[in-house]
Amino acid sequence: MSDESNPPKVILLVEDSKADSRLVQEVLKTSTIDHELIILRDGLAAMAFLQQQGEYENSPRPNLILLDLNLPKKDGREVLAEIKQNPDLKRIPVVVLTTSHNEDDVIASYELHVNCYLTKSRNLKDLFKMVQGIESFWLETVTLPAA
């Protein structure tokens, strides 16, 4: 339960893998942090949501974005670039959560001002711990700008 002085944290997960998004959802279900998880499956939907366009015109502003790089319709790299170039969106922390170990992807993401780049573990237990770490750091430890 939240009140107006302490609204739930809004987490936007942009992930086309249903298995990976289910895992993030399961980890966050165990959370003591009041939150709302919104899952979108492609980059076009993510940008429409963030820019409050079309069916997303009343969407909440996320406190944190978890972004896969390899997305349909609009690549995660393009989404990241658009977020960080938009004055209304650029302060929202973006964590890239991807399977890519490619050094060029890491460098390109940081050049686009990603806040954190994490490579998904193939081991479910390790991936579970990684998502718990994201939650702990980004939703409990740091001070985020108001949504």
Swiss-Prot record:
Q: What is the annotated role of this protein in its UniProt record?
A: Forms a two-component system with Cph1 in which it acts as receiver substrate.
Q: Does the keyword Phosphoprotein apply?
A: yes
Ranges for the Response regulatory domain?
Answer: 10-135
Which domain of life does the protein's organism represent?
Bacteria
Record InterPro entries = CheY-like_superfamily (IPR011006), Sig_transdc_resp-reg_receiver (IPR001789), TCS_response_regulator (IPR052893)
The record ties this protein, via Pfam families, to: Response_reg (PF00072)
Q: What SMART domains does its record include? A: REC
Output the GO biological process annotations, alphabetical, semicolon-separated: phosphorelay signal transduction system
Keyword Cytoplasm listed? The answer is no
**What's the name of the protein?**
Response regulator Rcp1
For this chain, the Swiss-Prot or TrEMBL PTM comment says:
Phosphorylated by Cph1.
CDD domains membership: REC_Rcp-like
Keywords associated with the record: Phosphoprotein, Two-component regulatory system
Q: Which residues cross the membrane?
A: none
* 4-aspartylphosphate PTM sites in chain numbering: 68
